[in-house]
Amino acid sequence: MADAFVGTWKLVDSKNFDDYMKSLGVGFATRQVASMTKPTTIIEKNGDTITIKTQSTFKNTEINFQLGIEFDEVTADDRKVKSLVTLDGGKLIHVQKWNGQETTLTRELVDGKLILTLTHGSVVSTRTYEKEA
């Protein structure tokens, strides 16, 4: 099922992303730059290993993981987190934990688009990506 997420995805819409970053403690200047970028996400699968690369003029990140196995991650805003990604009901659920906090990044496919829902406490941001040819 994770195969359905494989591809190159370009951000086309973003809702409430600044509030989400603010809730994580991201500084004003970084939020301003990050809010203006339109990142490309590349999802690859090689055997049991999934790679998610996020590329933008702001910062490039890459994570490699296997479903259900916790791993260390350094986020785009330089948080050092413990991450766990699972597949549940056709959704990739990515949970990051650090310093007693937790945020969830849920990726799902809706009408051929990749919908990324970011949740931290009561703050929710939705980012919509379209697949590139």
Swiss-Prot record:
InterPro entries: Calycin, Fatty_acid-bd, ILBP, Lipocln_cytosolic_FA-bd_dom. It comes from the Eukaryota. The modification Phosphoserine is found at S23, S83. The modification Phosphotyrosine is found at Y20. Its main location: cytoplasm. Hexadecanoate binds at R127, T128, Y129. One of its GO terms (cellular component) is sarcoplasm. One of its GO terms (molecular function) is icosatetraenoic acid binding. SUPFAM superfamilies: Lipocalins (SSF50814). The keyword ATP-binding does not apply. One of its GO terms (biological process) is response to fatty acid. Keywords: Acetylation, Cytoplasm, Lipid-binding, Phosphoprotein, Transport. The keyword Nucleotide-binding does not apply. It is found in: Cytoplasm. Pfam families: Lipocalin. The modification Phosphothreonine is found at T8, T30. PROSITE patterns: FABP. Belongs to the calycin superfamily. Fatty-acid binding protein (FABP) family. Forms a beta-barrel structure that accommodates the hydrophobic ligand in its interior. FABPs are thought to play a role in the intracellular transport of long-chain fatty acids and their acyl-CoA esters. This is Fatty acid-binding protein, heart. It comes from Mus musculus (Mouse).
